[in-house]
């Protein structure tokens, strides 16, 4: 109760103080985050748009365990969260993307420089606060560096509980970071660098990242083709829908990369979806830039492996003769020892 009274006094004090420029417009970048677990439990928090194309920074503990999530903007429009771009449970931060709306998204621009000790900062009210509520003014008492030159600020006062993850601005209205609450009540709050939040990305080895895997929403693939393929190879196939989602996304991003099609067709065949697998191979063979020999070889292996299974009920002409034909086409394009060995297997 004393904390609430103090916060109220502090807010009242800030009414007469100079606020960041264009505060009412800046508040349009604040959003509500509604995350739902597999059991239907609702977890709520606030987020901040940091780009025009829908990148949102939210609290990790709100997104943990979620199978789907919705972002509600200041106009009341709902946007589905389409992918997780990065996460860190220790710092309670998630970077994610929401689907675009009909209008351009309002967003906060990250400040080019972090404040020094004794600098004033402005904590925005929660996303649900009245539009006339001013920022809470606080002072930086300590600046600590972590990671790749990122800053972690200690404030003078404890922020209100509703301001957890609230954006923190400088006088010009640019984004410094996000409020983090102290572990003990009554202790000063902290600000984590917005640049750190924006740096969170999915890497090739993150298929086993427990923080990311605790959020059951598709992760963004790593930026390079090689890293994206490594990520998919390391991803568990237990969640078939998620695995296929990654493969389809890879094909969408890299339509000339043969591996995406072979991964898709092989998984479809493994699931008994033979017609779909055949269609995937046919599509890939028509796609400019793909390697036809690798596609024919993959198709041959799929048919051969199926033919070796006692429970396999032949689909169309998928037999050893067809498997041999496919690998012969591969060898005619590129005569590799691997293809010769596969021909011997099929005889």
Language-model features: where?
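Flexible, gly/ser-rich surface segments that form the specificity/activation loops bordering the active-site cleft
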Residues: 18-22, 104-152, 159-164, 179-190, ...
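Short coil turns that delineate tetratricopeptide repeat
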Residues: 255, 289-291, 333-335
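Alpha-helical segment of the N-proximal tetratricopeptide repeat
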Residues: 220-271, 311-313
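Residue-level recognition of tetratricopeptide repeat
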Residues: 266, 301, 308, 345-346
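A conserved glycine-rich beta-strand in the N-terminal activation segment of trypsin-fold
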Residues: 19, 36-53, 58-59, 78-80, ...
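C-terminal cap/linker of serine protease catalytic domains
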Residues: 19-20, 177-241, 248
